[in-house]
Curated annotation (Swiss-Prot):
Protein name (database record): Ferredoxin--NADP reductase
InterPro entries: CpcD-like_dom (IPR008213), FAD-bd_FR_type (IPR017927), Flavoprot_Pyr_Nucl_cyt_Rdtase (IPR001709), FNR (IPR015701), FNR_nucleotide-bd (IPR039261), FNR_plant_Cyanobacteria (IPR035442), OxRdtase_FAD/NAD-bd (IPR001433), Riboflavin_synthase-like_b-brl (IPR017938)
GO cellular component, one term: plasma membrane-derived thylakoid membrane
Catalytic activity: 2 reduced [2Fe-2S]-[ferredoxin] + NADP(+) + H(+) = 2 oxidized [2Fe-2S]-[ferredoxin] + NADPH
Annotated keywords: Antenna complex, FAD, Flavoprotein, Membrane, NADP, Oxidoreductase, Phycobilisome, Thylakoid
Amino acid sequence: MYGITSTANSTGNQSYANRLFIYEVVGLGGDGRNENSLVRKSGTTFITVPYARMNQEMQRITKLGGKIVSIRPAEDAAQIVSEGQSSAQASAQSPMASSTKIVHPKTTDTSVPVNIYRPKTPFLGKCIENYELVDEGGSGTVRHVTFDISEGDLRYLEGQSIGIIPPGEDKNGKPHKLRLYSIASTRHGDMEDNKTVSLCVRQLEYQDPESGETVYGVCSTYLCNLPVGTDDVKITGPVGKEMLLPDDEDATVVMLATGTGIAPFRAFLWRMFKEQHEDYKFKGKAWLIFGVPYTANILYKDDFEKMAAENPDNFRLTYAISREQKTADGGKVYVQSRVSEYADELFEMIQKPNTHVYMCGLKGMQPPIDETFTAEAEKRGLNWEEMRRSMKKEHRWHVEVY
């Protein structure tokens, strides 16, 4: 039975480049082709776009002042509506015209949004939420920051990241470079209205080796101190395909996290157990092993424990609290310690073809975890290096460490 513990394939090789998608666009200039055309403030245009040109077309539409309200594979439409039709013609010929609800296709390579907003043309988001996640007695500062993105076309999937460009200049007089942060919300946002994106941000601070002074990270400090209401936060992205949640609603998902590496897994678990959106009903198994220094540093603790209590057959929650717990030989308990403790059970799980393993956080956990699985593989006459290589090829082994 799953619960809380704190003690010791691809289906085909079709060429995606040949697939077509239909963009439903409002407010586009003229027939949607000529950049000098007057912008039409009302009416819907349907544009057929080859997969290979999806990003370029998004940029062109934005430049023309249009807004994409839905994207669908062409084969899903009752019929392809030609470019430049009026809204009246479109509604008479296509069921898509009657709704402006954003369509989020299944997570395949053809539908992963990437670089909708770039550093030279970032989206300006508005901070609508910024609160502390570390309880009294914990170490450091971690904030949950939410942005309103309703005025743009930013779309994302669980497991992706966005970039934040802090204001100001560096010591050389150049604009600060962007920093990437894993998204902590589902594709529908914390409000489940497709209008927000959330981050889990730890304020970076360290001692200068020469002066001994405390140095604070530029972007993390900017975000952690960002006032609610700030409406000019420069956002880029989304980026990333390595950490995407599988579409399989019956999958087994093992998540290994330290600190703010919890961000993508919060998005996963919200989608699995809290959101229960009509487009995804999780029926598989999820196991989160979460490493922190103190109990007070367990981010989103109440929410995770509530989900585990309400879904005991589907969600298992295990903590590794390094400065409060001890291993059998008296050592500190880390994520890799828990993996070693449950090695036999975990290894049996990852041999199943529908099991995905995700690792996010400090890179120090990766080598000992590999050592543990190497030993388990040898017990069974298997080669872990070959197994891991095969899992990566099958998109079942996902690592994002730093």
